[in-house]
Amino acid sequence: MNDKEIQRLVEEISLRYFEMPFLHRATFNMRLRTTGGRYVLKSHNIELNYHYYKLYGREELIGIIKHELCHYHLHIEGKGYQHRDRDFRQLLEKVDAPRFCKRMPVSNKGERTYVYECVECSFQYVRRRQMNIRKYVCGRCKGKVKQIEKRLDS
């Protein structure tokens, strides 16, 4: 499915379920990782997560589109468009849109960890973020710290 097809699908869903036209752009955003889609307030555009479409299919994508269109139409009308607003929850129920999308499975991307060791007391620190060993010292004895290992856990 490409951006033209997604634009057409969003326009059809908007007319069918909301009886109002969608007058802005709907696209896939390949950079989205943790959310099914997002409604951009400034531009009124809708961005959808391609990975959800690939993983869960068209039905889940339609649910996400309905959810984002709830944000869109309520914002355009000047009503409460945020998740906590009553207008938003009522419209979700009316169009049978999910309040939350399914969770994405844990990424198969390996977790990188860094292992540091104090030169004085031999205490080991395991960290996800790299640290500047010239700037930081051991929290126990104030000794120098050296990096002893960099591992890629999978």
UniProtKB/Swiss-Prot annotation:
Main location: cytoplasm
Binding residues annotated for Zn(2+), in chain numbering: 67, 71
Pfam families with a match to the protein in the record: SprT-like (PF10263)
Active site: 68
Binding note for cofactor: Binds 1 zinc ion.
Residues covered by the SprT-like domain: 7-148
One of the GO BP terms on file: response to stress
InterPro entries membership: SprT-like_domain, Uncharacterised_SprT-like
Keywords: Cytoplasm, Metal-binding, Zinc
Localisation per UniProt entry: Cytoplasm
Necessary cofactors: Zn(2+)
GO CC annotation terms, alphabetical: cytoplasm
A molecular-function term among this protein's GO annotations: zinc ion binding
Recorded family membership: Belongs to the SprT family.
NCBIfam families, sorted: PRK04351.1
Protein's recorded name: Protein SprT-like
Taxonomic lineage of the native organism: Bacteria, Bacillati, Bacillota, Bacilli, Bacillales
